Amino acid sequence: MATTSRRPVLTRAKVIVPVLLAVALVIAFVAIFTRLYTDLLFYRSVDFSKVFTTVIYTRILLFLIFGAVMAVVIGTNIVLGYRFRPQLRPLSTEQQNLERYRSAIEPYMKLVLVAVAAVFGLAAGLSASGRWRTWLLWVNGESFGTKDPQFHRDISYYAFTYPFQRFLLGFLLTAVLLSLLVTVLTHYLFGGIRLQTPGERVTPAAKAHISVLLGLLALLKAWAYYLDRFGSVFSSRGVATGASYTDVHAVLPAKLILLFISLACAVLFIYNIFQRGWTLPLLGAGILVLSSVVIGGIYPAFIQQFQVRPNEATREQPYIERNIAATRAAYGIQNVKPQSYAARTDVTAAQVAADTGTVPNTRLLDPSKLSRTFQQLQQIRGYYTFPKTLDVDRYTVTGADKKQTTRDYVVSVRELNQAGLGADQRNWINEHLTYTHGKGFVAAPSNTVDEGQPAFDEGEQNLPQKGDFDVRENRVYFGEMSPNYSVVGTRQVEIDGPGPGADTQVTTTYTGDGGVSIGSTFRQALFALRFGEKNLLLSGDITKNSRILYERNPRDRVSKAAPWLTLDGDPYPAVVNGRITWILDGYTTSDGYPYSARRTLGDVTADSVTAQSGNRARQAANQVNYIRNSVKATVDAYDGTVTLYAWDESDPVLRTWMKAFPDTVKPKKDISPSLMAHLRYPEDLFKVQRDLIGQYHVSDPRDFYSQEDFWQVSESPDGSGQPQPPFYVYSKLPDRSGPSYNLTSPLISARSSKLAAYMAVSSDPSNYGQFTLLKLPPGGTINGPVQVQNAIESNGDVANKLTLWRGAGSQTIEGNLLTLPVAGGLLYVEPYYVQARGGSGYPTLQGIATAFGERIGFGTSLGEALDKVFGSGAGAAAAGAGTGATTTTGGGGQATTQGGGTGAAPPGGTSGLQDAVNDADSAYKAGQDALRKNPPDFNAYGQAQTDLADALSRLRTLASPPTTPPAASPTPSRSAAPTTRGTAAGSAPPGTTPAVAAPAGPSGPPSPAGATAGPPQQPRAAPPPG
């Protein structure tokens, strides 16, 4: 009965298990096919299908080759172990126990053999397929045209061939070791190895089999020692990267000796086939291990300790020279030469006023601090947003005087923010068919403000787009904040921003070629599987003309189109030929440049901005010792077109990848002038180079060894503990005839916080990549950024202002602390923004601090702050660069005034606020005077504190936003005729508390808080149409 009851169970198990396996295989196949096919459709949509097929074919080839080799090797050794099994086995407890396993396995021996070989082959094939980059570099490697100084081999051997040889060696070692393992197990299972049986413990056949494998292992070890010799050029044993004195005079000879010992051991293992016992193999293995310890370890350590250490500077000198030359060449800094810069501190007001190349262009808007300001002033609708960190670019525009001037702007695009939709609007149709794109390019001159707010030249609080940049297509379907996917060209119209009425919307239908056609049921089903959304298959709104947009982040699109590139972490938008275009910098890297110092990209490119920014990607923790900005990439914001341009056509790594992926990178000559005008020196590359310049500006090996003149990147003065980021500024450098668009960074001494150097590189097409490295006198006294920040905030005037602002219910935000070469010295400039605490405020510029030497100045404009440092007239070139009305300054430093209104009145009325500020200032001074008396007058001090508290209370009341903000219209009112704005119109008096903005509603832009309490607000005039 028991047997009968089990039969149905066993029968069901025999049916269910294969069915479940079949279903699992079908699901896996469908999932893999769906992903691969939809990826192929993406690559076809951007005309990079050759990249997809090349990578897939290469991975399949590697999978088949290495998987098959591993499977055959493992399977062959199992077969040999089984075939060479003894026919008769001595009777013992061990063999009796093993017999049960033999009886269970032998009927299914072929199945076991195939299964074991398949498992190892599958694992090896999958592992090898991931090394497609190594394979393609080896197959297509181009010459560097430079040889290493030790072995005189072309650098391409170390960059392309050596990594593949190492991979192949590792694979073969793994195959032989696994073969040895399965061979020993097979012989043990079938009686060829008997551990607990008297007499012969290993049969001759098993001994021969194992001896051959051990001989192969010794041969591979000899090859490993041979490759180790070339690997010494990456050694970190000495003072600098590369083969050191000990490596050349001890390690290399030791590796050669160990190579021959390994060959001798291989001979002994093979010879052991004809000998009894294991004496010879054990002797050989013992000699190899002992030699590795003595010759490979103790001897080099002895040389290092007793020959090198006592005379290390002299012994290592030629190898340090090699490292310096190789590192400078590998990172593209071989032509960066320090030039002496006195950094004067005895500068007059007239000399500062005469510096019209830098002072008028000083950046006052910090792109990492003003996202909230752009959001409040330019959001327009709740379903639009701006990234956390804005970007900087430069544009040449025609001013009111018909002259063209170039200046830098803080720029961004108005991206789609579906999180801003109401709860009743969150449905699949709205999120994927209706709200599909952002709209608008927004730009504000970085050196200009209007009542503390950006003076937008492009992207005013209205659509369609108006401004100076001739934006003809401003829809953003591909952006940093775009949804995962959208379906366009459906029966649903797309929301395209606010209409002319208060509650109206403009609609549109996508007409571009971007994305993938999704008209067929087959494709709809595939994308429904990919995105896990049944509506893609069932929706009646999708037609034969519909297209699905996915992989929409510009960085992701370029990364898929060029998977061999390392991309800069900061894509930025620009207006190119009337279209919004994302620009990205692509790097070719290698870790195979002999003698070059290695850096971890994720470490050296991290700073205080990347640590806090949500839209700047951090580099991976990849070690490199060679890098080039070899590719400039663009992504069209409307149709997603990806274009790659060869920027450094001499780069051998780029040439190698172009050979592997032909016709995917366009030549440099195809870059249009409109695009060329917006290319800039990449930030991540500059961070790597400035880190290296801190050491490798030293060319003398003895000085390099002493490390006395090493520099480092300063900590950010914001207290984050991260390195200070570099800054893009439009400025005139001492070795240039005029202002240029530069990426800059100060460097401090590695032994103190004093400023040691100033580093800048140009982004202008005429002198792109030209470095300026200003070296300050040794033992200088110019403070570094952190020291300057402390000095500014401990200054009495600054402390007073900060106390008043913070006491009035607001918080202060320090902007970027810029270091600028001005009038033969170094000027620090830091804007101060103020915003109300809570969710309704946004930062407005209310003060500017300057520092020069030991002198600190603070004012409501840059000119005022400069006058306080240098004396009257110093700030003439910076007229208007501050918190007052809009005044723009051209590259030549001549100020031109734009038409418009006087700007918003402070909440609560100007006179009431000013009275409160004056009373607070007087009370504070009275208290300080009372304390300075001898003895202190504490009665007077107490009365002063009471008066101060009363003044601050009035300030809080006047500055508080209204509890119910007034309704906002979608389009700001415009004045009938523009009025002239002078530098005095609407200027914020010293100590004025900034206006606080109420949050923008879904139907329009924000309104100034407290507007009902003050005088009527005069509207700002619209800029002339672009």
Curated annotation (Swiss-Prot):
Coarse class of the protein's main subcellular location: membrane
* Record's bilayer topology term: Multi-pass membrane protein
Task: Specify residue ranges for compositional bias: Pro residues.
Answer: 1016-1026
For this chain, the annotated S-S bridges are: none
Region of interest called Disordered, as start-end residue ranges on this chain: 877-916, 958-1026
Any one cellular-component term (Gene Ontology):
plasma membrane
Keyword hit for Repeat: no
Q: Does the keyword Amino-acid biosynthesis apply?
A: no
Fetch the InterPro entries from UniProt: UPF0182
**One Pfam family for this entry, by name?**
UPF0182
**Residues passing through the membrane, by range:** 13-33, 60-80, 108-128, 167-187, 208-228, 250-270, 283-303
Where composition is biased (Low complexity), the residues are: 877-888, 970-1001
Compositional bias annotation for Gly residues: 889-903
Q: Where located?
A: Cell membrane
What keywords is this UniProt entry annotated with? Answer: Cell membrane, Membrane, Transmembrane, Transmembrane helix
Q: Which family does the record assign?
A: Belongs to the UPF0182 family.
NCBIfam families of this UniProt entry? PRK00068.1
Please give the name of this protein. UPF0182 protein FRAAL6027
Biological source species: Frankia alni (strain DSM 45986 / CECT 9034 / ACN14a)
